């Protein structure tokens, strides 16, 4: 429940930032924002949609929502970014599947004049104006500290990183204090959200 409230807040906050909430805006002027997420099937991102739709209504924004069905399909994300540019979006709110493979598409959108806001998982681009999400490095440290506080004696950890191609997955793993919590093994599963 807490994660869903956070998702709704992220969606609303991202759109509010883009519209310059509180600034003077002609009531007839509608700005166009594309929300491109990791998966349209994810419960988390469905909550983001709810927040984004509420903010779009409140701030008179034209909102398009798109994303691949699974969280592995960065090629579809790149195509959707290009489609948003062609459709005349003024901004993209984006959650990257692959921080490196999505970078060129985000750079191209920014060069076309779009504002870029990333949520949940950013992209390897200096064109991102705002990131809204968790401090994933600190979250990794907190998780490791919680384990270390509860266990005495030798400890061997198996690291299962949900997706090493995402910025948030990499940062959470980097937050693990390696000397005091050595990894006995490391895996990155691939699974579908269906």
Explain the meaning of each model-derived region.
Residues 1-19:
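Sec-dependent bacterial lipoprotein signal peptides
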Residues 21-194:
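A residue-level marker of the well-folded mature domains of exported/periplasmic proteins
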């Amino acid at each position: 429940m807490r994660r869903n409230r956070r998702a709704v807040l992220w969606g609303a906050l991202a759109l509010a930032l883009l519209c310059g909430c509180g600034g003077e805006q002609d009531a007839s002027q509608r700005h166009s924002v594309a929300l491109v997420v990791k998966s349209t099937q994810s419960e988390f991102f469905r909550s983001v949609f709810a927040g984004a739709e509420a903010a779009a209504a409140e701030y008179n924004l034209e909102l398009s929502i798109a994303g691949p069905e699974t969280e592995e399909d960065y090629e579809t994300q790149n195509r959707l970014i290009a489609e948003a540019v062609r459709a005349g979006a003024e901004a993209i709110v984006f959650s990257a599947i692959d921080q490196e493979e999505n970078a060129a598409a985000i750079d191209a959108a920014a060069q076309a004049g779009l504002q870029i806001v990333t949520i949940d998982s950013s992209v390897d681009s200096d064109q991102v104006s705002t990131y809204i999400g968790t401090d994933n490095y600190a979250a990794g440290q907190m998780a490791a500290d919680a384990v270390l506080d509860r266990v005495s004696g030798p400890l061997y950890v198996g690291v299962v990183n949900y997706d090493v191609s995402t910025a948030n997955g990499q940062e959470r793993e980097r937050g693990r204090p390696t000397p005091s919590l050595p990894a006995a093994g490391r895996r990155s599963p691939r699974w579908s959200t269906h």
